[in-house]
Regions:
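A short, Gly/Thr-enriched small/hydrophobic beta-strand-prone motif that recurs across taxa
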Residues: 23-34, 200-207
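A short, amphipathic beta-strand motif
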Residues: 27-33, 44, 83, 152-154
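Short, ordered, surface-exposed loop/turn motifs in non-cytosolic proteins
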Residues: 35-51, 55-56, 88, 131-136, ...
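A short, solvent-exposed beta-strand micro-motif common in secreted/extracellular proteins
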Residues: 44, 79-85, 162-173
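Short, acidic Ser/Thr/Gly-rich low-complexity loop/linker segments typical of extracellular
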Residues: 56-67, 71-75, 106, 144-151
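A glycine-anchored, Pro-Gly-centered beta-turn/N-cap motif
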Residues: 121, 160-163
Length: 207
């Protein structure tokens, strides 16, 4: 006959897991410009009032075809990023951004160590050899983040119920340091529109 105490413990664990699943919601965010057109590659993220203990995951930004891939990345503060070079030529990756200043001098293949991005902010990447190579890393203080697709949509999943500051960023913001934000109470899944004002911005053409 099963031990009643063990049965109660198991039941409590299942109840806890089930209740957490019920309380988790998702936000669908539509990011639009001043004409109502969708914005691709916008970063959206939700900062909870109570700090999350979810650890940062690792990330990869490739160099392939003398371009960074992806153009835009979003990572949680504390993330280790690896910069593999798959080209037949060497690259010299660097950034002078206040959020992370670093350089990986001329190399091919995979660097021996990743770069840790431990401060929130925007990091602009370049190559000291190919000045048309550019990419952006937006470092955030939350595990709840996503990037918009061609339809301007992004989904933040598994958000515990509570109060959040929802923020949106894009590398072509009209006011470079003015991140758009909204206060959001998450109790159930919902769709939110985030308007952004962008300035003309041309990614350098590959030579």
């Amino acid at each position: 006959m099963p031990n009643p105490f063990v049965c109660r413990v198991i039941a409590s664990i299942f109840l806890l897991i089930f209740s957490q699943q019920i309380q988790a919601a998702e936000l669908t965010i539509d990011v639009l410009d001043s004409t109502g057109s969708p914005i691709e590659n916008a970063v959206v993220y939700a900062e909870p009032d109570n700090k999350s203990s979810i650890p940062a995951a690792n990330a990869i930004i490739e160099q392939r075809g003398k371009q960074f891939n992806p153009l835009v990345s979003v990572v949680q503060a504390g993330t280790d990023v690896t910069f593999p070079n798959f080209d037949s030529v060497r690259h010299h990756v660097y950034s002078f951004s206040p959020a992370k200043t670093f350089e990986l001098k001329l190399y091919s293949g995979v660097p021996t160590s990743p770069v840790k991005f431990d401060k929130a902010g925007t990091v602009v990447l370049g190559c000291n050899i190919h000045d048309y190579m550019v990419a952006f890393i937006h470092v955030v203080d939350t595990p709840y983040f996503a990037k918009t697709n061609k339809l301007g949509k992004a989904v933040l999943r598994d958000l515990p119920n509570g109060n959040y500051t929802l923020k949106a960023w894009h590398y072509a913001l009209a006011k470079e340091k003015e991140i758009v934000e909204k206060q959001v109470l998450v109790k159930e899944s919902q769709t939110i529109v985030m308007p952004l004002s962008l300035k003309p911005f041309m990614i350098p053409a590959k030579k």
